[in-house]
Design a protein with these regions (language model features):
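Sec-dependent bacterial lipoprotein signal peptides
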Residues: 1-27
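Feature for extracytoplasmic/surface-facing segments of secreted or surface-associated proteins
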Residues: 27-230
Length: 230
């Protein structure tokens, strides 16, 4: 019997242990999987979110609240409606931006760019209707409802809702939207793209004077979502 492989087993195990120790140290003792992803002992992860809050105009100096299945954080937007926040969280998260009479919502199923606009509000209207509920109940109860969490944490489900918003608004209001991926596309207020689409929707009557979706647009997306239940 050849016993020579034993010479290599111990060094290999030693190297593996050192690598594992170094990885844990890089995550401050938490478990790490993949590249730059650290999971804390309570199964949360450090999530960095950014985005722009706008209605066609920037929601400047607005309150931003990120509420996740586990974990929350707050910040303020800058003069251009931009926000950045880091939260130890279990996904998904709801983003709420409040400024005066305007309170808009969005969601995040990963780290990265997730904007908050009247379009994202309507996306949640559609998603809530698919789940047989309304936006207030979806936002208020998702932390304790695995079915809501599953839908909100699914990129495919969220992107399908986003596409439904674009299709419904274009057909109803006779506009051409140039940024169909409005949830995750970085944009600057006053520039072509997501913001110019918001301006066009406001002119067409889909967004009211307070920067909120018009009731007719809410009804439109409620009916569309209910017609495609999850």
């Amino acid at each position: 019997m050849n016993l020579h492989p034993r010479r290599f087993i111990r060094p290999a195990l030693g190297t593996l242990c050192l690598a594992t120790l170094a990885t844990l140290q890089a995550c401050n003792g938490d478990a790490c999987f993949g590249v730059d992803v650290c999971f804390n002992n309570n199964n949360t992860q450090t999530v960095a979110l950014s985005g722009t809050a706008a209605t066609g105009d920037a929601l400047a100096s607005a309150q931003v609240t990120v509420s996740c299945v586990t974990g929350s954080a707050t910040t303020l937007t800058d003069g251009g409606g931009n926000y950045r926040v880091t939260v130890n969280a279990a996904l998904p998260c709801v983003v709420t931006v409040t400024s005066g009479g305007t309170s808009l919502h969005s969601l995040a199923y990963a780290g990265g760019t997730f904007n908050t606009t009247p379009e994202t509000e309507l996306m949640l209207v559609y998603l809530a209707a698919q789940l047989g509920t309304n936006t207030a109940a979806l936002i208020g109860n998702f932390q304790g409802n695995p079915r809501y969490q599953q839908a909100m944490n699914s990129p495919n489900t969220v992107q399908a809702a986003q596409s439904a918003v674009v299709t419904s608004l274009q057909q109803r209001y006779s506009v051409t939207l140039t940024a169909p991926a409005f949830l995750t596309t970085s944009f600057t207020v006053g520039q072509p793209g997501v913001d110019s689409d918001l301006v066009a929707l406001a002119k067409a009557g889909a967004i009211d004077a307070n920067g909120m979706p018009d009731p007719a647009a809410v009804t439109l997306l409620t009916q569309a979502g209910a017609a495609h239940p999850l």
